[in-house]
UniProtKB/Swiss-Prot annotation:
Residues 31-330 form the Protein kinase domain. The active site is at residue 166. This is Lymphokine-activated killer T-cell-originated protein kinase. ATP binds at residues 37-45, 63. Phosphorylates MAP kinase p38. Seems to be active only in mitosis. May also play a role in the activation of lymphoid cells. When phosphorylated, forms a complex with TP53, leading to TP53 destabilization. One of its GO terms (cellular component) is nucleus. Its EC number is 2.7.12.2. The gene is Pbk. The modification Phosphoserine is found at residues 31, 58. It is an enzyme of class 2 (transferase). The lineage of its organism: Eukaryota, Metazoa, Chordata, Craniata, Vertebrata. Activated by phosphorylation.
Length: 330
């Protein structure tokens, strides 16, 4: 690949009603009666088992607004959850989590029900691996995740003209031994124009700080589909390093039993590193990782024009399982 070798408002009640009216009546239990699967900013995700009258139905993952949110943030998260429901309902792709319902629970909180097949987030798997072996995921697994994520992003970008806006390991769910790989949490997605650019002046790129590209950190940065590609590259980096981008803990020569103190965190270095490509310890990765490293590097080029599109990543990865030959001009 050229360049790859060189890398050293409507009324809220009305809005809610319009979404809920198209959803059949669903009885969502109160939070204490469901198993908690995880949580995010302002929301929690629960397992809802559905077996009425002795019938067996597939379970759902139910995302609910946290009851602990104050009124201001509750309004923000309610809008975000409503937006996510409206977007998710119109998506249909094997690498995007499926919509099931949007309604209110018995405690009055808004709920988004999604498909659930026993998945864990990629972030959970990274944390588990860090505690167990501490070794990177096999290169073949990383490339499999890359292909399935790229297919989901290609669908969002090309067919739905949507920027996901918050790609990271926490927003990828995995079933079993990487049998299925799906992107979730489309609540901060932004519309793309025909040039794959976010042009809506009211649109605000949310993202999550360590995964943000340089253009999203600039005051007048132009956001395109390549913002997702940058965060996608950092997600592959997470699988190779088992770390959060740019959040550097003490050096390896520090006593393993030593407690990490918040005062040890270098704020200045962290903020200076945001939007850049984090380094990789090449001594920990053998030759089998070369393709994954190349893909990570080209996706995290600072200039968005030098990153491949999701469609081109898919094309390259599907060609005999190879990812060499990626051009940075797509």
């Amino acid at each position: 690949m050229e360049g790859i070798n060189n890398f050293k408002t409507p009324n809220k009640s009305e809005k809610r009603k319009s979404v809920l009216c198209s959803t059949p009546c669903v009885n969502i239990p109160a939070s204490p009666f469901m198993q908690k699967l995880g949580f995010g900013t302002g929301v929690s995700v629960y397992l809802m088992k559905r077996s009425p009258r002795g019938l067996s139905h597939s379970p759902w993952a139910v995302k609910k607004i946290s009851l602990l949110c104050d009124d201001h943030y509750r309004t923000v998260y309610q809008k975000r959850l409503t937006d996510e429901a409206k977007i998710l309902k119109n998506l249909n792709h094997p690498n995007i989590i499926g919509y099931r319902a949007f309604t209110e629970a018995s405690d009055g909180s808004l709920c988004l029900a999604m498909e659930y097949g026993g998945e864990k987030s990629l972030n959970d798997l990274i944390e588990e691996r860090n505690k167990d072996s501490g070794s990177p995921f096999p290169a073949a697994v990383i490339l499999r995740v890359a292909l399935h994520m790229a297919r989901g992003l290609k669908y969002l970008h090309q067919e739905k003209k949507l920027l996901h806006g918050d790609i990271k390991s926490s927003n990828v769910v995995i079933k079993g031994d990487f049998e299925t790989i799906k992107i979730c949490d489309v609540g901060v997605s932004l519309p793309l124009d025909e040039n794959m650019t976010v042009t809506d002046p009211e649109a605000c790129y949310i993202g999550t700080e360590p995964w943000k590209p340089k253009e999203a950190l600039e005051e007048n940065g132009i956001i395109t589909d390549k913002a997702d590609v940058f965060a996608f590259g950092l997600t592959l980096w997470e699988m190779m390093t088992l770390c959060i981008p740019h959040v550097n803990l003490p050096d390896d020569d520090v006593d393993e039993d030593a407690t990490f103190d918040e005062s040890d965190f270098d704020d200045e270095a962290y903020y200076a590193a945001l939007g850049t490509r984090p380094s990789i310890n090449m001594e920990e990765l053998d030759d089998s990782y070369q393709k994954a490293i190349e893909l990570f590097c080209v996706c995290t080029n600072e200039d968005p024009k030098d990153r491949p599109s999701a469609a081109h990543i898919v094309e390259a990865l599907e060609l005999d399982g190879q990812c060499c030959g990626l051009s940075s001009k797509h």
